[in-house]
From Swiss-Prot:
It comes from the Bacteria. Pathway: Protein biosynthesis; polypeptide chain elongation. Its main location: cytoplasm. GO terms for cellular component: cytoplasm. This is Elongation factor P. Pfam families: EFP, EFP_N, Elong-fact-P_C. InterPro entries: Elong-fact-P_C, NA-bd_OB-fold, Rib_uL2_dom2, Transl_elong_fac_P/YeiP, Transl_elong_KOW-like, Transl_elong_P/YeiP_cen, Transl_elong_P/YeiP_CS, Transl_elongation_fac_P. Involved in peptide bond synthesis. Stimulates efficient translation and peptide-bond synthesis on native or reconstituted 70S ribosomes in vitro. Probably functions indirectly by altering the affinity of the ribosome for aminoacyl-tRNA, thus increasing their reactivity as acceptors for peptidyl transferase. GO terms for biological process: peptide biosynthetic process. SUPFAM superfamilies: Nucleic acid-binding proteins, Translation proteins SH3-like domain. GO terms for molecular function: translation elongation factor activity.
Amino acid sequence: MKINGNEIRPGNVIEHQGSLWVAVKCNAVKPGKGGAFNQVEMKNLIDGTKLNERFRAAETVERVRLEQKDFTFLYQQGDALIFMDSQSYEQLELQKDFVGERAAFLQDGMTVTVELYQEKPIGISLPDQVSVTIVEADPALKGQTVTASYKPAILENGIRILVPPFINAGERIIVDTNELIYVRRANEKDK
């Protein structure tokens, strides 16, 4: 779908210079002399490079709609992660580096959303929060309750995060998969 350069908004995916780009920041600029333009900071969906580009209102760009499909994580085989399409039951193999450091949070049966462009995977979204067990945590020191302090802990998947002093090894907690931070203790519903 063609749109004018001044209609590009953050989150839009556009085709530019033969690649797919997602608009990160958009700034409408109206200089004292000359025509107005849209200053767009974009990130390449394939290799992650950034680009700043000016689009005049008269320019048109191709806005791309990505298809989003739910997949279920099945298992890991070496560096390959195997997912199954929830509707067609076809399997999809993605490399671990495609998912990034969040791959450590994948659990058997977890539902993820994969963004596809012309049947090719472009991005993946994990649930925002997951329940994990702490395998190692430093003991709480007396007197640490006065100030808001955190201590290091190691999760069952090997990721290191900071947790409040009252959290101990063996407890289940909720972790934000985007920021890799402690959210809260897990309760029975979260397991």
